[in-house]
Amino acid sequence: MKLTCVVIVAVLLLTACQLIIAEDSRGTQLHRALRKATKLSVSTRTCVMFGSMCDKEEHSICCYECDYKKGICV
């Protein structure tokens, strides 16, 4: 009975610690550009090639960066 109570308290304490840590780290992600590039590399969608024509829609779909003045993917 005592051991069960100790285990329950330990689990509750560890759960609380995990929630506190997760809440504190929200919005502090480092290297966002790297994460974006990683997401694009594992994407199953067809991407436009570098130097291809792009606009805001294509840029948001796949192009890493769109030079809107020239209208090309860089």
From Swiss-Prot:
Protein name as annotated: Conotoxin Bu4
Cell compartments where the protein resides: Secreted
Signal peptide: 1-22
Disulfide bonds: C47-C63, C54-C66, C62-C73
InterPro entries: Conotoxin (IPR004214)
Tissue-by-tissue expression: Expressed by the venom duct.
The organism of origin for this protein: Conus bullatus (Bubble cone)
Pfam families: Conotoxin
Record remark: domains: The presence of a 'disulfide through disulfide knot' structurally defines this protein as a knottin. The cysteine framework is VI/VII (C-C-CC-C-C).
Residue ranges listed under propeptide: 23-45
Disulfide bond found in the keyword field: yes
Primary subcellular site in the record, as a coarse category: secreted
Transmembrane spans: none
Keyword tags: Disulfide bond, Ion channel impairing toxin, Knottin, Neurotoxin, Secreted, Signal, Toxin
Record bears the keyword 4Fe-4S: no
Family in the record: Belongs to the conotoxin O1 superfamily.
A single Gene Ontology CC term: extracellular region
GO molecular function terms listed in the Swiss-Prot or TrEMBL record: ion channel inhibitor activity; toxin activity
